[in-house]
């Protein structure tokens, strides 16, 4: 594995950590992983600042803990990364959570020797149309 591959693997591990209830419920962990200039465009199209998303994630974690529902980690699929610049990696992946599939992209920036997510966007994947099934063949 090349150093570039190792860095992408590290960023993927950090993104997957962000999908865990443990990290999403920890202000300190989120503070370490979100870049000071972090912004997000959510599936609704709303733009979120770093402060807004921190508050939202912590509130969601509290609600999940109270309900004792949900899973410990949001399921992700096909996560892949590629370098965009010397210190910027883009991740693309899909998640399934609460009955919704979302296509996602995150930009991670390395600064001071550590990786932090700079930008994140989610786009809702519409449900696939129901497949019609052919009636059973006549005997």
Indicate where each model-derived feature is located.
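A beta-strand edge to alpha-helix "cap/lid" segment located at domain peripheries
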Residues: 2-32, 37-139
